[in-house]
């Protein structure tokens, strides 16, 4: 990101996200061409969904998700973790750094055998979005129905 303190955000943020999306599309293409993942059914739509989720939490557009982004993601999902648990999770996922993980690491985890944790997180988030609150006044309850 640029060194200047331009706090505007609209157009610059849009350009940053467009560049980030192009970069992630290139990585998706590498995974589509990789014979290791050729047996994975519906791979293009999975990669697209993973790209959207990754972009949602990589707000600064630097290509890596750090501890604070992961913490925000898990808190948003209602599964807060301690700092040590977050470090351990990132260490399991990342191929190099202990403080961040890249989109490639994220895809390897999602498409590999260790994807159960993150798949569960993403599935939980989707279920949370589908649940709509009832509209209108609440139903009347009798005293016998109260706990």
Curated annotation (Swiss-Prot):
> Where in this chain does the record put each EF-hand domain?
45-80, 81-115
Keywords on this record? Answer: Acetylation, Actin-binding, Calcium, Cell membrane, Cell projection, Cytoplasm, Cytoskeleton, Membrane, Metal-binding, Phosphoprotein, Repeat
- Report the PTM annotation: Phosphorylated on serine residues.
User: Binding residues for Ca(2+) 1, per the UniProt record?
Assistant: 58, 60, 62, 64
Residue positions where N6-acetyllysine is found in the record? 11
Q: Which GO terms describe its cellular component?
A: actin filament; cytoplasm; cytosol; glial cell projection; lamellipodium; nucleus; perinuclear region of cytoplasm; phagocytic cup
Q: How does it sit in the membrane?
A: Peripheral membrane protein
Localized where? Cytoplasm, Cytoskeleton; Cell projection, Ruffle membrane; Cell projection, Phagocytic cup
SUPFAM superfamilies per UniProt: EF-hand
Q: Could you say which tissues express the protein in this record?
A: Abundantly expressed in the testis, moderately in the spleen and lymph nodes and at low levels in the liver and thymus. Detected in macrophages.
Q: Which PANTHER family match?
A: ALLOGRAFT INFLAMMATORY FACTOR 1, ALLOGRAFT INFLAMMATORY FACTOR-1
Q: What is this protein called?
A: Allograft inflammatory factor 1
Q: Which organism is it from?
A: Mus musculus
The protein's gene is named Aif1
